[in-house]
Amino acid sequence: IYHDPEFEALCLDWAKWLMECIPRTREGGFQHVTSANGDRQGVRLNESEMWIDTLFMTVLFLNRMGQKYGKQEWIDESIKQVLMHIKYLYDTHTGLFFHGWSFNRMDNFGGVFWCRGNSWFTLGILDYLDMFKGTLNQGVKTFILDTYKAQVRALRDLQGEDGLWHTVLDDSTSYEETSGSAAITAGILKGIRMGILDDSYLPCAKKAIRAILKNIDTDGTVLKVSGGTGMGYDRDHYKNILIAPM
């Protein structure tokens, strides 16, 4: 965490807001609060909705703050959120994650396996576990790692011929997407480095790296990156997201 009094105060305020004020779903899940459609200054609460985005954007932060400031209640809340997001977003049939879950609809919206959303778990969950420095309950850690390994097995089977993954992972007619592919690759490489995955995953990672490098322009612009992606009710929503090089 950046050691600047101003930013430290902001981070503490945000952590307290997450614990005390963030809108919650049934069972206490964090709602994924976003900017309003067409209004970056507005707020959309996404009532009773859980998104995979939240794990990477919010839960990692809460755990890191809890670890830094010795706030066990913040750490415990982060564990609850990880387990709850796995409970409602992980698909045991495929090993992949749905983008979201609605307690109002009692379904996973369009039931779509979005590449970038899955990549946030692949990479983010190892960063999350790293923060515990071996202190996480072994049963919880094993459950999370088993989920990670099952997801990576599924992702390896879905890698495109050129090395990238499609924005709808199990739909080869959807475009290949670089940002999600990069995070998946980083998550696989970190898994190998940590000894969680064996070296049989190296060819998959190396193939992806070659494809990713081909999609970085000479000025550093990353090509084939899908723009901001809200919740979709069908595959076409994701397939029609504009490509916005970064």
What is each residue range found by the language model?
Residues 1, 40-55, 104-123, 140-144, ...:
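Solvent-exposed loop and edge beta-strand segments that line ligand/cofactor-binding
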Residues 10-34, 72-98, 144-163, 204-221:
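Long, well-ordered core segments of solenoidal/helical folds
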Residues 1-57:
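Extracytoplasmic mature domains of secreted/periplasmic and thylakoid-lumen proteins
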Residues 91-95, 131-139, 159-165, 194-199:
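Surface-exposed helix-capping loop/turn segments at secondary-structure junctions
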Residues 1-6, 57-71, 120-140, 183-197:
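Well-ordered alpha-helical scaffold segments within catalytic/enzyme domains
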